[in-house]
């Protein structure tokens, strides 16, 4: 089978590139492949009460139509530069902001609209001032929260639109290889069940998301495609009583606060705050980390957020992914395949937590399928020091987060995929192959991943 465009990965980057292509040119023959399942078939066994993680491959939470974001809490950050996302590396600031606005319009078209945060800009500015007085930095971002419980139906809406326009969607298609025979002839080999298929495309868009980062690196190594190693962020998922943070989260849903630690001078930040949310496991095929999400309709009595410290390696080893995986595997050895939970008091006092002490606390854990243990046995001393010092400083901004009963789950690791070297349209030099989204190191959240899809699609549209 021959196609004008083959898109590998049906996450935000892949979906938005397909949308842009078929909307602007209805004659294009497009195939969209994903190693995971369609929205209706993305069923995690843990959805049934009492069922532990089955280590499915592919993981229904991370892979499938909509990407890893489908079962996230659906926070949309409308900003061109945040964390590992920086669209201004590929275009001017004004063009990046315009692109973000265009991305928002498409989200809105498919009902992915919600109340805008900060809900009160004057109060948000006062909060930022309070953070600055405490010696830290608050980044104000235009945000919308869609909720984990509503995202699947929105993603289904995009998929229905694409299929109605003639895009071929192929689920559970595990791409094995991409072979370039000429600039405009590429052979994509994928496995579906026990069968192996080969399809041909004039243009290839590679967008397998975070779970495809390792595969992209293997592909780059195989064909000599240059890439740059990037930093990672390592830390914990912090869980506190919801009312402790409501004064801030009612105004700024997901406050991103940057803190400089004293001992090492490192930067640690809050990230992915979930008011009334739930701590969740994240399966990386071989090891388990933690994450968090929030539903639109169902709320817990707690709020959780990531508290992560940036790690950059220089020489002789620059492979930060391998470093992060090593920490995760140590945690899984100690937790017997499960994340570790520890009270802040126990971490400070240098003793492992036990469930009978955690259960006596004032915070009921929202993730029970974990092991009470000692995070100091998992993470380097430097990371633990940053967490403890960071929480002390954060307590000056949000009193109560440094309480003894505060719960810490670990490890939380934000892998920054190696960045494939491309031109500013994300295209390789001598082939019509594009690398976009999180897995290619070009984006780090739902909105910027979607934006990279628009850029690649528009470059293809100019040439077809």
Where are these predicted regions, by residue range?
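Residues forming the flavin
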Residues: 1-80, 122-464
């Amino acid at each position: 089978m021959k196609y004008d465009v083959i898109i590998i990965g049906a996450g935000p980057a892949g979906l938005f590139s397909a949308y842009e292509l078929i909307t602007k040119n209805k004659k294009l023959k497009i195939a969209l492949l994903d190693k995971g399942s369609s929205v209706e078939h993305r069923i995690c066994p843990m959805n049934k009460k009492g069922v532990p993680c089955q280590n499915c491959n592919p993981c229904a939470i991370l892979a499938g139509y909509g990407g890893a974001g489908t079962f996230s809490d659906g926070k949309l950050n409308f900003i061109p530069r945040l964390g590992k996302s920086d669209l201004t590396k590929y275009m001017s600031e004004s063009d990046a902001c315009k692109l973000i606005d265009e991305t928002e319009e498409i989200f809105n078209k498919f009902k992915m609209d919600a109340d805008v945060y900060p809900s009160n800009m004057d109060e948000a500015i006062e909060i930022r001032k309070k953070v600055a007085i405490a010696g830290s930095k608050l980044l104000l971002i235009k945000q919308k929260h869609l909720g984990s419980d509503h995202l699947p139906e929105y993603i289904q809406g995009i998929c229905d639109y694409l299929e109605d326009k003639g895009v071929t969607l192929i689920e559970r298609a595990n791409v094995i290889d991409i072979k370039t025979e000429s600039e405009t002839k590429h052979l994509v080999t994928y496995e579906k069940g026990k069968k192996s298929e080969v399809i041909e495309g004039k243009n290839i868009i590679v967008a397998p998301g975070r779970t495809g980062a390792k595969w992209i690196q293997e592909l780059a190594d195989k064909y000599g495609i240059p890439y740059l190693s990037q930093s990672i962020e390592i830390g914990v998922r912090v869980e506190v009583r919801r009312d402790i943070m409501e004064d801030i989260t009612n105004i700024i849903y997901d406050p991103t606060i940057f803190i400089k630690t004293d001992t090492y001078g490192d930067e640690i930040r809050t990230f992915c705050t979930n008011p009334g949310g739930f701590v969740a496991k994240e399966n990386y095929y071989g090891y388990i980390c933690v994450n968090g999400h929030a539903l639109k309709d169902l709320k817990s009595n707690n709020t959780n957020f990531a508290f992560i410290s940036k790690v950059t390696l220089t020489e002789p080893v620059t492979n930060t992914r391998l470093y992060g995986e090593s920490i995760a595997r140590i945690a899984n050895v100690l937790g017997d395949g499960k994340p570790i939970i520890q009270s802040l008091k126990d971490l400070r006092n240098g003793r492992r937590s036990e469930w009978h002490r955690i259960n006596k606390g004032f915070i009921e854990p929202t993730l029970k399928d974990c092991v009470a243990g000692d995070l100091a046995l998992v993470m380097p001393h430097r990371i633990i020091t940053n967490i403890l010092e960071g929480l002390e400083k954060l307590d000056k901004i949000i009193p109560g987060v440094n309480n003894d009963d505060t719960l810490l789950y670990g490890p939380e690791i934000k892998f920054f995929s190696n960045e494939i070297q491309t031109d500013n349209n994300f295209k390789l030099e001598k082939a019509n192959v594009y690398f976009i989204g999180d897995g290619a190191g070009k984006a780090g959240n739902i909105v910027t991943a979607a934006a990279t899809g628009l850029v690649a699609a528009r470059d293809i549209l100019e040439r077809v």
